């Protein structure tokens, strides 16, 4: 178990799969992650099913190719009581699975009581962008008590949304978004 005791700046993602509990203790991590060819660009590249991140704020900028988010590139665990104000960008024509909290959250994972006010964007123009305010892709995941007030910027005409861009089998409950532009998509 880890507890953050001060605000910090991070320039590289935690690359190993995170299996413990990380309590941000109300502090903010400012990210400066700029790797246009990078996958799983976020504070935590991957959160395992046993992993939990809570009470954390994210600021700064994150740029990557696939699985790009504020807290997690890929989440299989639990993210609770977190916020993102960072600009999250999927670079290149292949920039996809981009979300404010997680690029992808899947297979029984949870995102609870979180919000995004950062701009979420992708340079991809084709199908499969999966761009969302909370999670880019959320198959078989649970997203509850969350909101998005961040702008969603994409060249794509499908697979983007205020909460989740894609998500076969996703459960979204008690979530809302503040309208910015013409959001559509899964939720």
Indicate residue ranges for each PLM-predicted region.
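Predominantly extracellular beta-rich ligand-binding scaffolds that present long acidic/polar faces
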Residues: 1-187
């Amino acid at each position: 178990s880890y507890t953050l005791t001060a605000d910090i700046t991070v320039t590289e993602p935690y690359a190993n799969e995170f299996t413990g509990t990380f309590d941000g203790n109300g502090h903010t991590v400012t990210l400066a992650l700029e790797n246009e060819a990078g996958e799983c660009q976020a504070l935590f590249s991957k959160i395992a099913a046993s992993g939990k991140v809570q009470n954390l704020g994210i600021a700064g900028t994150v740029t990557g190719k696939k699985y790009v988010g504020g807290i997690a590139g890929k989440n299989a665990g639990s993210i609770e009581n977190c916020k993102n104000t960072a600009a999250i960008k999927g670079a290149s024509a292949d920039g996809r699975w981009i979300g404010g909290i997680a690029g992808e959250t899947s297979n029984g994972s949870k995102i609870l009581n979180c919000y995004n006010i950062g701009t979420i964007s992708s340079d991809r123009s084709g199908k499969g962008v999966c761009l969302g305010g909370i999670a880019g892709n959320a198959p078989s995941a649970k997203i509850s008590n969350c909101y998005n007030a961040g702008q969603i910027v994409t060249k794509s005409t499908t697979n983007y949304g205020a909460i989740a861009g894609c998500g076969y089998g996703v459960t979204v409950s008690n979530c809302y978004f503040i309208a910015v532009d013409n959001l559509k998509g899964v939720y």
